[in-house]
Amino acid sequence: MNPVAGDDVVVIARDVTKRFGDTLALDHVSLDVHRSELLVLLGLSGSGKSTLLRCLNGLHPVTSGTVDVGGTRVDQASGAQLRALRRRVGFVFQHFNLVGRLSCLENVLIGGLGRLRLPRYGALTYPRHMRAEALAHLDRVGLADYADRRADTLSGGQQQRVAIARTLMQKPALLLADEPVASLDPENAGVVMDLLFRVCIEEKLTVVCTLHQVDLALGWAHRLVGLQGGRKVLDRPAVGMTRDDVMAVYQRVEPAVTPARRV
């Protein structure tokens, strides 16, 4: 019998395999992700992290295996079903994907377009309650005072926070974040990871995030999953893990101080 996501399980992936031509990107990866869990995928470039993330919302169709997200069988979904699913699955990209010439408020409002019948042009064309909601999300990420600023005038860390606010505007059940801090300095990377952690806890939102930074993963993740050559080689709660435990995924050990965990 095929697994069906229950009340506490948001993602169920079973034996997921993905090939791009002759290249095996994922090799029989199985994974459960629970509600209000921040799960970090770790591994070298090319290990399959981003591919797995995109298989979870159907951006990459699986070659074999099954993916269930909130009761929707992604691997069997029609185009209409995938569009409906993506309205419930937020995606935060490494390079922000904001519309630079639009204000921060307008960029956040774009996250709510899936709830409207027709496209909108300009913040004032959105319903008043949605404008208030978008402002609340900007306030949540500490950028309410920047609502009228063009997005392309903000720093990288600020732009990523706007992107998270836009994703929250979708009211997602699942948030996927692909290397969300890769282009940020350490201070802003910590701010963004802390924001994702707080959203996960306070909104009971499930977050699956790919990272390269082991120390950030140890500091903020509830659970760590390591990929190596497309195979899952690590799946453990982050509590009690050391940097050396995690670096086995990378087949090397680098000395560093592990930060105190967030509670």
Curated annotation (Swiss-Prot):
InterPro entries: AAA+_ATPase (IPR003593), ABC_transporter-like_ATP-bd (IPR003439), ABC_transporter-like_CS (IPR017871), ABC_transpr_PhnC (IPR012693), MetN_ABC_transporter-like (IPR050086), P-loop_NTPase (IPR027417). SMART domains: AAA. The keyword Metal-binding does not apply. Residues 11-254 form the ABC transporter domain. It is a peripheral membrane protein. The complex is composed of two ATP-binding proteins (PhnC), two transmembrane proteins (PhnE) and a solute-binding protein (PhnD). This is Phosphate-import ATP-binding protein PhnC. It comes from Mycolicibacterium smegmatis (strain ATCC 700084 / mc(2)155).
